[in-house]
């Protein structure tokens, strides 16, 4: 059984880049057909660990869809007023998460 550190709708932060984001889906292991260099560079995490689909905001506040290993993420500790668009996205996903699982 795979145990995930983060849940769908949870706000997180990229450990290296510092970008905030929201988990929108979870794969129990790496599931993309062919990894791109950006997805695997600097990442020693085995492909058998959890991987997360995350919508992040770059340093200009623009949304970016990313696919990241659990080891690249940390829990978001900032105030909910720092990233209002991510707060709204997290709330919508959390409300719909029970529907998405069935």
Curated annotation (Swiss-Prot):
It is found in: Cytoplasm. Its main location: cytoplasm. InterPro entries: Hemimethylated_DNA-bd_dom, Hemimethylated_DNA-bd_sf, HspQ. GO terms for biological process: response to heat. Pfam families: YccV-like. Keywords: Cytoplasm, Stress response. The keyword Cytoplasm applies. The keyword Ribosomal protein does not apply. GO terms for cellular component: cytoplasm. One of its GO terms (molecular function) is DNA binding. Belongs to the HspQ family. Involved in the degradation of certain denaturated proteins, including DnaA, during heat shock stress. This is Heat shock protein HspQ. It comes from Pectobacterium carotovorum subsp. carotovorum (strain PC1). The gene is hspQ.
């Amino acid at each position: 059984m795979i145990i995930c550190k983060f849940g769908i709708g949870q706000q997180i932060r990229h450990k290296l880049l510092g970008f905030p984001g929201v988990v929108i889906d979870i794969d129990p292991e790496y599931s993309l057909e062919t990894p791109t260099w950006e997805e695997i560079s600097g990442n020693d995490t085995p492909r058998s660990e959890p991987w997360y689909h995350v919508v992040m905001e770059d340093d200009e506040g623009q949304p970016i869809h990313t696919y990241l290993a659990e080891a690249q993420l940390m829990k978001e500790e900032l105030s909910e007023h720092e990233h209002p668009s991510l707060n709204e996205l997290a709330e919508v996903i959390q409300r719909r998460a029970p529907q998405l699982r069935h």
